[in-house]
């Protein structure tokens, strides 16, 4: 897969995150979006470089596990543990761990990387101090698309969302903390946040993300 293809897959995942994110739950958008982006890129690589054939019944189980994982991620604001997944799916924890292991399919170290396909995936993971292409593509697509989307908001709306969801910051901020920054009440910040998120969901605002679906 070419690097730009990975970027495109990551942005498709980001668009899904924007569409499905429920801000009222109070969790960081960056955490939720990163999960979707990583899943989209990983799935794309696996589709192009599968080395082990998974039985149909196991694929169905993996799909169910992924679906429930997304639900629990939205509910808890973090990825669920195998123990939590086992409880929700009414399955033994050891079976959950087995499914998770199978889902992480081995990727051939000979998988071509780059426009000229003269490099291979193995070339990029020999030095563990370097960032993997997958992580690099995830980070770049999230930064780029998020910047473009927020640029369509007013300066105040964009700053409120950046502070609330920890975008380009070390941590997110509470309604009270953001309110102090703007010298307004927490309720006013809640209103600004809600209005900004409604704008992001409008087709005219999400065009920058939807364009990545066009061939």
UniProtKB/Swiss-Prot annotation:
Residues 60-136 are annotated as: Sigma-70 factor domain-3. Its main location: cytoplasm. One of its GO terms (cellular component) is cytoplasm. Residues 149-202 are annotated as: Sigma-70 factor domain-4. Disulfide bonds: none annotated. Residues 175-194 bind DNA. Gene3D superfamilies: RNA Polymerase Primary Sigma Factor, Winged helix-like DNA-binding domain superfamily/Winged helix DNA-binding domain. Keywords: Cytoplasm, DNA-binding, Sigma factor, Transcription, Transcription regulation. Signal peptide: none annotated. SUPFAM superfamilies: Sigma2 domain of RNA polymerase sigma factors, Sigma3 and sigma4 domains of RNA polymerase sigma factors. The keyword Protein transport does not apply. It holds the Pfam family Sigma70_r3. GO terms for molecular function: DNA binding; sigma factor activity. InterPro entries: RNA_pol_sigma-70_dom (IPR014284), RNA_pol_sigma70 (IPR000943), RNA_pol_sigma70_r2 (IPR007627), RNA_pol_sigma70_r3 (IPR007624), RNA_pol_sigma70_r4 (IPR007630), RNA_pol_sigma_r2 (IPR013325), RNA_pol_sigma_r3/r4-like (IPR013324), RNA_pol_sigma_RpoD_C (IPR012760). GO terms for biological process: DNA-templated transcription initiation. It is found in: Cytoplasm. The keyword Transcription regulation applies. A motif (Interaction with polymerase core subunit RpoC) lies at residues 5-8. Sigma factors are initiation factors that promote the attachment of RNA polymerase to specific initiation sites and are then released. This sigma factor is the primary sigma factor during exponential growth. Interacts transiently with the RNA polymerase catalytic core. This is RNA polymerase sigma factor RpoD.
């Amino acid at each position: 897969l070419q690097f730009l293809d990975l970027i495109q897959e990551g942005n498709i995942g980001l668009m899904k995150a924007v569409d499905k994110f429920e801000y009222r739950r109070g969790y960081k958008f960056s955490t939720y979006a990163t999960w979707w982006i990583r899943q989209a890129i990983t799935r794309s690589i696996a589709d192009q470089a599968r080395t082990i054939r998974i039985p149909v019944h196991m694929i169905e189980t993996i799909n169910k596990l992924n679906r429930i994982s997304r639900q629990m991620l939205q509910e808890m604001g973090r990825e669920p543990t195998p123990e939590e997944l086992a409880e929700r799916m009414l399955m033994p924890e050891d079976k959950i761990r087995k499914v998770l292991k199978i889902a992480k399919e081995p990727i051939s170290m000979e998988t071509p990387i780059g426009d000229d396909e003269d490099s291979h995936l193995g070339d990029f993971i020999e030095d563990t101090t370097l960032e993997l292409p997958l992580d690099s593509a995830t980070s770049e697509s999230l930064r780029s698309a998020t910047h473009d989307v927020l640029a369509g908001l007013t300066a105040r709306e964009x700053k409120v969302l950046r502070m609330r969801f920890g975008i380009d910051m070390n941590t997110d901020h509470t309604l009270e903390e953001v309110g102090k920054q703007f010298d307004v009440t927490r309720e006013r910040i809640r209103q600004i946040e809600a209005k900004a998120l409604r704008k992001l969901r409008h087709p005219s605002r999400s065009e920058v993300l939807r364009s990545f679906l066009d061939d």
